[in-house]
Amino acid sequence: MKTTAEIRQSFLDFFHTKGHQIVASSALVPENDPTLLFTNAGMNQFKDVFLGMDKRPYSRATTAQRCVRAGGKHNDLENVGYTARHHTFFEMLGNFSFGDYFKKDAIHFGWEYLTSPRWLGLPAEKLWVTVYETDDEAYDIWNKEVGVPAERIIRIGDNKGAPYASDNFWAMGDTGPCGPCTEIFYDHGEHIWGGPPGSPEEDGDRYIEIWNIVFMQFNRHADGTMEPLPKPSVDTGMGLERISAVLQHVNSNYEIDIFQKLIAKVAELTGEKDLSNKSLRVIADHIRSCAYLIADGVIPSNEGRGYVLRRIIRRAVRHGNLLGAKEAFFYKLVPTLIDVMAEAGIGVKEKQATVEKLLRLEEEQFARTLERGLALLDEALANVKKGELSGEVAFKLYDTYGFPLDLTADVCRERNITIDEVGFDREMEAQRLRAQSASQFGMDYNNVIRVEGCTTFEGYTASESLAKVTALFADGKPVERIEAGQSAVVILENTPFYAESGGQIGDSGYLNGQGFSFEVKDTQKYGQVFGHIGELVSGSLTVGKSVNAVVDVKRRHNTSLNHSATHLLHAALRQVLGEHVVQKGSLVSDVALRFDFAHHEAITKAQLVEIECLVNQQIRANHLIQTELMELEAAKAKGAMALFGEKYADQVRVLTMGDFSIELCGGIHAKRTGDIGLCKITTETAIAAGIRRIEAITGENAMSWLHQQQALLAQSADLLKSDVNSIVEKIQQLQDKAKKAEKELQVLKEKSAMQAGSDLARSAVKINDVSVIVQKLDGVDTKSLRVVVDDLKNQLSSAVIVFASVVEEKVNLIVGVTSDLTSKVKAGELVNLLAQQVGGKGGGRPDMAMAGGTQIENVDHALSFATTWLKENL
């Protein structure tokens, strides 16, 4: 029996013999593709190749790609654990042709690998295929060349309610590459229920799709239109876990070798004896996706990819709760996962400490609200009518207790109850509108600019170049000519302008020529071409004209200093805080630098000083900043850091600063570290769970900042009538005096209040032999009010005291009740009723309670209400 690791290797070996380049799996976070939450198919890393925007030194490739499907269009989360084949994390085996072979070879390759005794050796009679209804070419290849009988070839049309919406018309997302496909199914046999694809029983488990071969012919735009791709290509995908189940003679993916150890470990940690329990499957699946997402740089959060990760973690924790887990358990699966996936050929061992820590923190945080949330849900489900949980309750669970909707849906499904998702969405939208802030978006040219060829970048050695205009874009479309005052994007054949990348802003400057001048305000990269974004200041500009491209040198110089300082800062952070520190984002401009990084606790002042000193030490060392082009793998072997989320070519630019910093970087830098002059950290904050942010300035900006701080100190010293070195001592003296004066004032207030209390005791009215005082005492703070109430309770044997006070535009309410009356009048109940009259809330003990409010105009009404209520209840 072949192991999963052996199957993976045999697939790669087979296609290598067919002239395919073996390409490593890309990260789970797609590189430079905002249309995807996660890598969900093998072809994601080749999207730009299919679109003709990127070129590789090979035209055939094969991969074993790590994938996650738990958000967006491809979302398997709700099915995971309840079916035999759905996963959040899986591996997709694939072979790809970039304008090389097409349908004939793709089909023959697939059949040979599956049926040849040298490879998988599956019985041919066990295999069925489907083709797109109008794809006669694919049908004939299967039938006439491969020899699959017509009764085992099924045509599938548009079965999803729209043109090209079919099980046999594949698309990566709402936009992007797409085309007809042919799928290969394995027949498990008559002993398992189910029918062939296209039949009413197709959802059964007898016929299982094992391979999808996509004939990539089109690029779908946001408006639904499709244009032919430059060259027809092939994209195939075969789920490793599915084919392993077939070859290991089991009907469920959860019974294959890589899942058995994980399920056994979950059972051990939770004490579950029944190894068929679906919760074991859920947790075994989820630890794979969670660990690999964290290893690839995703941090649990409340938005985007981080929220999907949080949903998966919380779903796993809840299933652990179902199994009886009494303490944090999920993170304890990581060592077993590393062992299992190491056997399978991939691992997260290098990130083990970070993965375990984040999982443990997230689990412990959710555990604090899980029990209370489940109690609320149980109560709500007990009162459900018509078998549906209200959207309002589901939203409260989400908003207050951190229950993702799919977690609530899991609980409801176990009790055959549905959720009012329309109501939930309505509540979510209402919250979004409440929190919405205005935002402006400029013209997005990413899906508009499609230009043949590429722009040659000359900016490493030049700041001025002669260049030819190859294309113009204005108002979201290509044009041949622009006039003065018109905003546009200018594409050049060559350019000294740096296009925004790696956190560094794009260059600005001018494109000048005879009779015209174009101001470049930003530079962006669109595929292989550089777009110079700006406005034509004078004259007219047409495609084909020559321009003198001149970069704003001062702005670029300041930007380069900040970029070089960012590299030093990154290295210093790793040296002081630990090797777990990785870049999570950056912004390098001519004004300042911003650096986001993974770190799970606050940075101390001493650490921050050490980091800053280390950076400036390297600046003073005046290292030569060297760049070298080399192969990506050689650069990594040399120790160069490849930053998460960046897309690198096979040949990369390695930037070194002495022996202190070595990174892959395509940005513009200083010539020596000494050019930076000075680096000053201005702020350090947390921006999300596990993510910190440092902002800093360099060079002249840093000196200017220091001068401002020095002036501020001098001004403060003048106000304090002190010298600069004695400011802290002087402030401490003033604080001590202020505290002393405050205490003396409080004593006077309390004396005054007690005197007022004696007067108030004489004014008490009787209601059924109970002394009642209801008064407004303006300007009396809450502490003094408590003193007066306690004094009056001691003076009066049986009493209820109600005071209202307005201090600094806020209403303070206090109710005191002597112990003999708390069975009749509870201070907390009465003060809450009064608080409602003034737009507030409060609470406390039965004999003493306080509240606050904001509606000053209703104070008299509240006191009148108190008198009436006491007459009715005493």
Swiss-Prot record:
The lineage of its organism: Bacteria, Pseudomonadati, Pseudomonadota, Gammaproteobacteria, Pasteurellales. Binds 1 zinc ion per subunit. Zn(2+) binds at residues 563, 567, 665, 669. Its main location: cytoplasm. Signal peptide: none annotated. InterPro entries: aa-tRNA-synth_II/BPL/LPL, Ala-tRNA-lgiase_IIc, Ala-tRNA-ligase_IIc_anticod-bd, Ala-tRNA-synth_IIc_core, Ala-tRNA-synth_IIc_N, Ala-tRNA_ligase, Ala_tRNA_ligase_euk/bac, DHHA1_dom. Catalyzes the attachment of alanine to tRNA(Ala) in a two-step reaction: alanine is first activated by ATP to form Ala-AMP and then transferred to the acceptor end of tRNA(Ala). Also edits incorrectly charged Ser-tRNA(Ala) and Gly-tRNA(Ala) via its editing domain. HAMAP family: Ala_tRNA_synth_B. Belongs to the class-II aminoacyl-tRNA synthetase family. It comes from the Bacteria. The gene is alaS. Its EC number is 6.1.1.7. It is found in: Cytoplasm. It comes from Pasteurella multocida (strain Pm70). This is Alanine--tRNA ligase. The keyword Cytoplasm applies. One of its GO terms (molecular function) is tRNA binding. One of its GO terms (biological process) is alanyl-tRNA aminoacylation. Keywords: Aminoacyl-tRNA synthetase, ATP-binding, Cytoplasm, Ligase, Metal-binding, Nucleotide-binding, Protein biosynthesis, RNA-binding, tRNA-binding, Zinc. PANTHER family: ALANINE--TRNA LIGASE, CYTOPLASMIC, ALANYL-TRNA SYNTHETASE.
